[in-house]
Design a protein with these regions (language model features):
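Acidic, Mg2+-coordinating active-site environments of NTP-dependent enzymes
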Residues: 210-352
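Phosphate-binding loop of NTP-binding sites
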Residues: 2-43, 49-248, 252-260, 316, ...
Length: 352
């Protein structure tokens, strides 16, 4: 309606058109400020750069309109600018997209500076042990479980929240990694082939966990085989002295041969030659009791408040890596018992 009234006024009286546009803009701004959003916009440095670039584009469009259509009459010039700004407002999403596109070389240069700084920080910590975690699902839970167990013996940092892309990992390194950290657990997500390899080239993990290979993000990967290849970029990047822990409960993992590094397979469902197994799983009112069996006759009886095979599988991976890294059985047993279930996810509810 506002655009219709503006168009009508612009043909009858340009000054009225500009006044109408000003009123409409002011009302829109007030509504924007007072509106409550579920997740408000965070004004990061990049967001500010995009909005400034968008404003500059609007000014340039307004100036061009004035020069082309304004002529020598002041009122026509003002009308041309008002019309241009109205068009910019209606196409604000296109303006911001164009600003983002124009800033791409600048953002690339800035991001590369952040990456170089992160590399330098990692290079200054040669004794830091890096564990990579990836998978179609289960990687976040495994990351948290492993962090809880390793923290019993090591000063351990994990990538927080959804900081699981290259730049998210870079931000974690620059803002959270401290010289006294001993272990760095890196969750790695991928939407395209090469994404995990890029993160590995940055952090150089010595241990890798592949929790699952499933039909996730097929719109970008194209096939389950490409998903498998991308998840195993983590395993392919490990040094010969490292170790890969892979979940043989998934056929696309069990069928994948690994020859470049020691490969330790784990399973909750059947043996299938896996080195690590969760057996004798019993669900109780207080959680789950189960036994973990590993190489060289290793065995440990555990109790957790968690429920469900998926949680036990993720716990199994975390326990296997912890044992590999030298965490004692008593510390593992205590940490596993202390892990809290995620709210609304297979947690026990007691009623009167």
């Amino acid at each position: 309606m506002a655009i219709f009234l503006y168009s009508l006024a612009s043909f009858t009286h340009p000054t009225a058109a500009m006044l109408l546009m000003g009123i409409f803009g002011a009302v829109t701004m007030v509504r924007y400020i007072r509106k409550k959003y579920k997740k408000p916009l965070v004004w990061t440095q990049r967001a500010r750069r995009i909005y400034v670039a968008g404003a500059v584009l609007c000014l340039l469009i307004g100036f061009a309109a004035m020069m082309i259509f304004g002529g020598d009459i002041l009122e026509r010039r003002l009308y041309s600018v008002a019309a241009a700004f109205t068009a910019c407002y209606c196409a604000s999403h296109i303006i911001l997209m164009a600003a983002n596109l124009l800033l791409r070389p600048v953002e690339k240069h800035i991001n590369q500076g952040y990456i170089n700084d992160a590399r330098s920080r990692l290079a200054s910590m040669p004794d830091l042990r890096v564990v990579g975690v990836t998978g179609s699902y289960g990687k976040t839970s495994t990351k948290h479980f492993l962090h809880r167990i390793l923290s019993e013996q090591f000063d351990t940092l994990m990538t927080p929240g959804s900081f699981n892309t290259t730049l998210g990992v870079v931000r974690t390194i620059r803002e959270y990694l401290k010289p006294y950290n001993e272990v760095f657990i890196v969750e790695m997500v991928a939407k395209n082939p090469g994404d995990i390899r890029e993160i590995c080239d940055l952090v150089h993990p010595e241990i890798g966990i592949v929790t699952a290979v499933g039909p996730q993000h097929l719109e970008s990967f194209g096939s389950i085989e490409n998903v498998q290849a991308t998840k195993f970029e983590l395993v392919d990047a490990l040094p010969e002295s490292g170790a890969a822990f892979v979940n043989d409960d998934f056929e696309m993992i069990a069928s994948r041969e690994v020859s470049n590094v020691q490969c330790l397979r784990y399973t909750c469902r059947d043996e299938r030659g896996a080195q690590w197994q969760a057996v004798n799983i019993v669900y109780t009112p207080s959680g789950t009791d189960f036994e973990v069996k590993g190489p060289e006759g290793f065995s440990i009886q555990l109790h957790t408040r968690l429920l469900g095979e998926a949680n036990i599988s993720d716990l199994l991976a975390a326990v296997a890596v912890a044992v590999y890294m030298g965490v004692g059985a008593d510390r593992i047993r205590y940490a596993v018992a202390q892990i809290e279930p995620v709210e609304h996810r297979l947690s026990v509810k007691r009623t009167a």
